[in-house]
């Protein structure tokens, strides 16, 4: 086992330990690429639904080339992702436990979309290098559907199966408000799964979602229609910060609750964004922000979650934010104190951490 500081087992030099760590990272990166292929080409789903399969059967079912399918399934067997029998034709299958992670897109363990996110950011490396050297950034839109869809489907199980079932009921007054019905705003909703989950969990509310990405808004409308809630869930292409009302109009708010799920750290103007949230909320209405569960302050020993967040910040969140002139450039690792400073600049008096437990996210109530 190689530690973060580069030290390894007894008798291993720091250089050897770091070399081992980079080799392990290379294996991990290679596996993510193979997971991307299996996800996007439908190979995992075919093995899950119809396995065991030979490479010819796998290729035929997915409309792919047998030679590539054969190489991929052998790599997957060597990596331990799929099982292979000992027969001469070597049929391969996907264990159910692995299907939970790689195929079942509503399972809380579904992590295949991580590969899409990494492929999206890796394909942006030439533009990232240019931005790092000369300034500017790389827009979320330019990272393509792998970034947009990967982010959306990665969070979907949590929204659909935990948000209204476990998380929001903890906030008793908010739960009561939503149960009674009313108007709800979902700012920066992406492909709309948070809005859809709110509507499914609280059948009396009407949800208005807002986002700056046209492709996300269009996808959100399709998703709401497919889930049968498009009569109560509506999406608009709006720059929330750019549309912030004057301070004097804050009391004219129309929403009984306002949410912002995992988007504030990406926003170029978080103070303007939160000013809008405050303005459109009715007096005393809850404004809820869900964002990354970061440490309270910078700590080199913060652990793997913070390592992952910094990785996303380097290649995705910070470059997207910096692609907008005048961006405050928060980055993925937005700490409690940073959010609090934005909220107070936007006119809020307090920021409370809600007693909702999640490994990746923290929920804040602004008031």
Region locations from a protein language model:
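Short amphipathic alpha-helical interaction segments
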Residues: 64-75
